[in-house]
Amino acid sequence: MLNNRASKIGAILLALFFVLTYLFPLNSRLLWQPDETRYAEISREMVVSGNWIVPHMLDIRYFEKPIAGYWINNISQLIFGHTNFAVRFGSVISILLSALLIYLLARMMWRNRQVAFVASLIYLSMFLVFSVGTYSVLDPMLALWVTASMVCCFWALKATTAKTRILAWITLGLACGMAFMTKGFLALAIPVIVMIPVTLYQKQFTRMLLYGVLAVLSAALISLPWVLAVAKAEPDYWHYFFWVEHIQRFSGDDAQHSSPFWYYIPIILLGVIPWLGLLPGALTSAWKKRRKRPELFFLLCWFVVPFLFFSIAKGKLPTYMLPFMGPLAMLMAKYGVDCARKFKMKALRINGYINIFIGVAAVVAILIIQLVSSKPIYMPYEWSKWVLAIVAFSLWGIIGYLCSTLNGKHWLWAASCSLGVSLCIGQAIPNSSIDGKLPQEFIRQNIDTLNASKYIVSNSVGVGAGLAWELQRSDIYLYERTGELTYGIEYPDSQHRLLKPESFEQWLENARKEGNVSVVITYKDPKKLAQMPRPEELVTNRRMAILTYEKRK
């Protein structure tokens, strides 16, 4: 057990780690397209318009996600203003609250502050958690509500009185309702598919069916006002959201992001870094002790069942695993603390060796690609960036070495392996990535030209959202490609926002009578630019170009 002094020091160090990893770099990093520019602009438009019911992007209906994740981002922008920090803070606060829930659940399970503290530390320092948790997507919000749901599930299973049991199931329903309003119907399935094997194992399946009605009612109670409001405002919303976004995306032959069954295995192995050395022992130990320790079986089901469920699905993304990193953090924390308490330090030392290997391998890979490969990551004038990347991964290896010395005594310092990467990544991104995936810099360099334009056109939805965010205007036109706005742009009041190549010159001629026109084009082949009408001004960064057509009388 931790004494009071050790608890205070641990809390201070954990808070410092959180500030350096999660908060300090937020505003300095440019927004990635299409994800971060998308969520930044959707919430900006909600705040400006006051419409918190129906999501729009570029003033075009956007039905791909429900509303609750946007609400968190909206509140963040209202508090922190028009900043990159505000765009990402919704993800950060969701991960922080998830870590607090993990601490609470670990205390409920083991009544041990040390294990609970280590579980939160491991969770916050996992590669998948901190990389997605400092990135503006909706998965951290989903992870928060799924974690809250699972805490309520365990609370309901352990409740000894009818009053407590009723309260737990009602609270579970509220958390599930928020998960549904963040990501949709699949979020409702997660607690169900986890609880079925758990309640069967603990002979509480009938009780789950009985009290589960309360969860269904409370989930409906919290979500029904928005469900009815969006149906009234946009009658077609639920048709698109259910059939296209769920049925086709999850199981259809044309599912988005289709990947093989084993896709999530390497994602998990990479995602638990810098704690990979603890994973095999934690899983095998939990499986062996599952009969005597039902909480370990609960955590195994929380991870394994959704892992298999999403592996069967055809559409896959790395971020889908985020809600299931919590149980792994708790299993590894329990295993690691038990190993240290029993002086069985082999796994803790191995974890240090793995981090040494990661640091050394990353440094060697950067040097080989940069100095030997015919296609280096960085241009010659970017030498400071790849040196910075080498320093960051060297720090990873050095910390791994410290964790492996003294028989693994300092094994918890593995959490700080990623500090160098987290603090340096924004400054170490090669210009080739900035030019293509981080449009903010190019937009800011040409902000006066863009602000002077009556019409702005882009052939990329992600870049278009970035333009709208930076210029604080949503009337961006789309050229040739509609991407994720394909459904919304088919509405009669939005069709004019799509400009097709065969009619573009005529549209341009008419538009120039009203003012300047700026066309922002993403391209790989310069021949793409030659296909456009000749502009008065052309600015390019080799991946994007701004073609400016001046006003004509």
Curated annotation (Swiss-Prot):
Instruction: Report the locations given in the UniProt record.
Output: Cell inner membrane
Q: Which residues cross the membrane?
A: 6-26, 85-105, 115-135, 137-157, 178-198, 208-228, 261-281, 295-315, 317-337, 352-372, 386-406, 410-430
* InterPro entries for the chain: ArnT_tfrase, Glyco_trans_39/83, LipidA_mod_glycosyltrf_83
A GO molecular-function annotation? mannosyltransferase activity
Regarding the membrane, this protein is recorded as: Multi-pass membrane protein
* Catalytic function, reaction form: 4-amino-4-deoxy-alpha-L-arabinopyranosyl di-trans,octa-cis-undecaprenyl phosphate + lipid IVA = lipid IIA + di-trans,octa-cis-undecaprenyl phosphate
Functional pathway? Lipopolysaccharide metabolism; 4-amino-4-deoxy-beta-L-arabinose-lipid A biosynthesis
Has UniProt tagged this entry with the keyword Lipid biosynthesis?
yes
In the Enzyme Commission scheme, what number(s) does this protein have?
2.4.2.43
What does the UniProt keyword field contain?
Answer: Cell inner membrane, Cell membrane, Glycosyltransferase, Lipid A biosynthesis, Lipid biosynthesis, Lipid metabolism, Lipopolysaccharide biosynthesis, Membrane, Transferase, Transmembrane, Transmembrane helix
NCBIfam families, per database record: PRK13279.1 (NF009784)
Please state what the protein is called: Undecaprenyl phosphate-alpha-4-amino-4-deoxy-L-arabinose arabinosyl transferase 2
Gene symbol?
arnT2
